[in-house]
């Protein structure tokens, strides 16, 4: 039986080992960063210990949910932070649980920028961004409530180094909490993406206009974080093709290529990119673009995400289109996803209505593993 299993494992590209810098991964199935809104008052909670440890396998790579770098970084209820001592202490047992099962765990550090409103901001001030352009109200994931956004305040040039420093300190705090590294959130219409995308960034100073100027803030964050904790512990997530939160770009391929070529200069560990087919939330669209030019240009580990199944994840690895594949919704609903992929076992269906509820169990830690259903 062991021999059969060993052979089966070898024939599944996603289940082959991979050396990511200093980290020896036993397979290529990555837990994507998933906002779950269960960190009450921005503090990670004990129920996250079980959630993350359920999704840990020996040599598996997990990316924690988006985690705010400062008190201006928040834009959703009960998302975690890492800017205070209390946050750091609350993360420690969660990180320890992942390490106890042999996992590698990175913290995704995040600033929402204009995707916020006064209610989430200190002293009810306006959210900050590269621009003063507001976002239109959006339907929440539950399809009932409407999210409203306060028009942002454009950051002055003098304020930008302070935001870069918030990312640096968040990375330092993540290391103090025991994380193996950090992923800089540069995707999905949040602050770093707002600076990069020409449909948002309307600045006329050194942080706006040309592609190089629009990417300046992102690369300053990368530089500061890499210098603080070492480039071999730093990744970044990018979505040049996506148009989330009214953050599109007129030439996404040029943006993606410029960014990966620039990232090579810093020697960071990985680049995590969203597939062009995931232009909007949760919808797979027909698309002629591919990530191959970025994949070929980037010298570190390449991670792809965006609507992958077992089949096309295996194909992407087998054909060299990516090194690792990040799974979100399927990993949320299948805590033992790598094992299910190995056995080609049926998958639990995910329940979208419980993605963002505050319940500490339902739709969070109650999805069964294969062992619990055997």
Swiss-Prot record:
Listed pathway(s): Lipid metabolism; oxylipin biosynthesis
Pfam families: Oxidored_FMN
Cofactor(s) the protein requires to work: FMN
Reactions it catalyzes: (1S,2S)-OPC-8 + NADP(+) = (9S,13S,15Z)-12-oxophyto-10,15-dienoate + NADPH + H(+); a 4,5-didehydrojasmonate + NADPH + H(+) = a jasmonate + NADP(+)
Tissues showing expression: Expressed at highest levels in roots and cotyledons, and at lower levels in leaves, shoots and flowers (sepals, petals, maturing siliques and developing pollen).
Induction: By wounding, locally and systemically, by cold and heat stresses, and by UV-C. Seems to not be influenced by UV-A and UV-B. Induced by the chloroacetanilide herbicides acetochlor and metolachlor, and the explosives 2,4,6-trinitrotoluene (TNT) and hexahydro-1,3,5-trinitro-1,3,5-triazine (RDX).
Keyword Acetylation annotated: yes
GO molecular function annotations of the record: 12-oxophytodienoate reductase activity; FMN binding
GO biological process: jasmonic acid biosynthetic process; oxylipin biosynthetic process; response to wounding
Catalytic activity, EC: 1.3.1.42, 1.3.1.-
Any Gene Ontology CC annotation: cytoplasm
CDD domains for this protein: OYE_like_FMN
Keyword RNA-binding tagged: no
Family listed: Belongs to the NADH:flavin oxidoreductase/NADH oxidase family.
Purpose: Specifically cleaves olefinic bonds in alpha,beta-unsaturated carbonyls and may be involved in detoxification or modification of these reactive compounds. May be involved in the biosynthesis or metabolism of oxylipin signaling molecules. In vitro, reduces 9R,13R-12-oxophytodienoic acid (9R,13R-OPDA) to 9R,13R-OPC-8:0, but only poorly 9S,13S-OPDA, the natural precursor of jasmonic acid (JA). Can detoxify the explosive 2,4,6-trinitrotoluene (TNT) in vitro and in vivo by catalyzing its nitroreduction to form hydroxylamino-dinitrotoluene (HADNT).
UniProt cross-references to PANTHER family, sorted A to Z: NADH OXIDOREDUCTASE-RELATED, NADPH DEHYDROGENASE 2-RELATED
The protein's name: 12-oxophytodienoate reductase 2
Source organism of the structure: Arabidopsis thaliana
């Amino acid at each position: 039986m062991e021999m059969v299993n060993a052979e089966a494992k070898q024939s599944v590209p996603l289940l082959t080992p991979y050396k990511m810098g200093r980290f020896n991964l036993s397979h290529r199935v990555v837990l994507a960063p998933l906002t779950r809104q269960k960190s009450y008052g921005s503090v990670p909670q004990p129920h996250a210990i079980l959630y993350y440890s359920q999704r840990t396998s020996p040599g598996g790579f997990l990316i924690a949910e988006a985690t705010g770098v400062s008190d201006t970084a928040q834009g959703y209820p009960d998302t975690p932070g890492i800017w205070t001592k209390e946050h750091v202490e609350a993360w420690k047992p969660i990180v320890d649980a992942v390490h106890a099962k042999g996992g590698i765990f990175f913290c995704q550090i995040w600033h929402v920028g204009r995707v916020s409103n006064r209610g989430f901001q200190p002293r009810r001030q306006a959210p900050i961004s590269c621009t003063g352009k507001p976002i239109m109200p959006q339907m929440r994931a539950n399809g009932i409530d409407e999210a409203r956004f306060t028009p942002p305040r454009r950051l002055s040039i003098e304020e930008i180094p302070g935001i870069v420093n918030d990312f640096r300190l968040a990375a330092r705090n993540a290391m103090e909490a025991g994380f193996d590294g950090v992923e800089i959130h540069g995707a999905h219409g949040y602050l770093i993406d707002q600076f990069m995308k020409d449909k948002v960034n309307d600045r006329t100073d050194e942080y706006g206009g040309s592609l190089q100027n629009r990417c300046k803030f992102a690369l300053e964050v990368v530089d500061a974080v890499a210098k603080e904790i070492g480039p071999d512990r730093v990744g970044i997530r990018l979505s040049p093709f996506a148009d989330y939160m009214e953050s599109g770009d007129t030439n996404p391929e040029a943006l993606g290529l410029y960014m990966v070529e620039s990232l090579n200069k810093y020697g960071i560990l990985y680049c995590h990119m969203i597939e062009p087919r995931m232009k909007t939330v949760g919808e797979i669209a027909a698309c002629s673009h591919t990530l191959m030019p970025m994949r070929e240009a980037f010298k570190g580990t390449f991670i792809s995400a965006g609507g992958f199944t077992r089949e096309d994840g295996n194909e992407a690895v087998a054909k060299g289109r990516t090194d690792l594949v990040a799974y979100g919704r399927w990993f949320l609903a299948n805590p033992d996803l790598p094992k299910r992929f190995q056995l080609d076992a049926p998958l639990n269906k995910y329940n979208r209505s419980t993605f963002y509820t505050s319940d500490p169990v339902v739709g969070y830690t109650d999805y069964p593993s294969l062992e619990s259903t055997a």
